[in-house]
Swiss-Prot record:
Native species: Antheraea pernyi (Chinese oak silk moth)
Protein name: Pheromone-binding protein 2
Physiological role: This major soluble protein in olfactory sensilla of male moths might serve to solubilize the extremely hydrophobic pheromone molecules and to transport pheromone through the aqueous lymph to receptors located on olfactory cilia.
Signal peptide: 1-22
Disulfide bonds: C41-C76, C72-C130, C119-C139
Regions annotated as coiled coil: none
Organ and tissue specificity: Antenna.
Keywords noted in UniProt: Disulfide bond, Pheromone response, Pheromone-binding, Signal, Transport
One BP annotation, GO: response to pheromone
Family to which this protein belongs: Belongs to the PBP/GOBP family.
InterPro entries attached to this UniProt entry: Odorant/phero-bd_Lep, PBP/GOBP, PBP_GOBP_sf
Length: 164
């Protein structure tokens, strides 16, 4: 279950990679593709629009998610993308494959999975998987900021709207 949360964090945020200036571009691609199932998750979980705003604001350096439904949305997206196994654990191969399919090289994909595992281990215990996912996501965001891999969400939204 905890690994599922990490995977969800990876996906929720998982949109990036290529150890250098290309990393924000890779993260943008990861984010765009991670979010493609959002309409389905929004409907299944009856998510309010405020959750979408939470996820949009997620990458802002000083933004802190507080709505547990955002964690639920990340869990839903990760499940839809088969980044977690049937037991809810992070599926390393699928997570790495997802990252590489959307622009990450082997090193970046491996580092993303490692970051999620580190965040999973350092996050406080919580029986509420949605809250646990939010904790892991916030840790993941912090680590991505340290690497300067943060995607430009205005570009992500612009490209998503262009596809619609």
């Amino acid at each position: 279950m905890i690994r599922k949360v990490l995977l969800s964090v990876l996906l929720a945020v998982l949109m990036t990679i290529n150890l250098g200036q290309a990393s924000p571009e890779v993260m943008k691609n990861l984010c765009m593709n991670y979010g493609k199932a959002m309409d389905q998750c929004k409907q299944e979980l009856n998510l309010p629009d405020s959750v979408i705003a939470d996820l949009y604001n997620f990458w802002k350096d000083d933004y802190v998610m507080t709505d547990r439904l955002a964690g639920c949305a990340i869990n839903c997206l990760s499940t839809k993308l088969d980044i977690v196994d049937p037991d809810g654990n992070l599926h390393h191969g699928n997570a790495k494959e997802f990252a590489m399919k959307h622009g990450a090289d082997d090193g970046m994909a491996h580092e993303l999975v490692d970051i999620i595992h580190g965040c999973e281990k350092s996050s406080p215990p919580n029986d509420d998987k949605c809250i646990k996912t939010m904790d892991i996501a916030m840790c993941f965001k912090k680590e991505i900021h340290k690497l300067n891999w943060v995607p430009n969400m205005d570009l992500v939204v612009g490209e998503v709207l262009a596809e619609v």
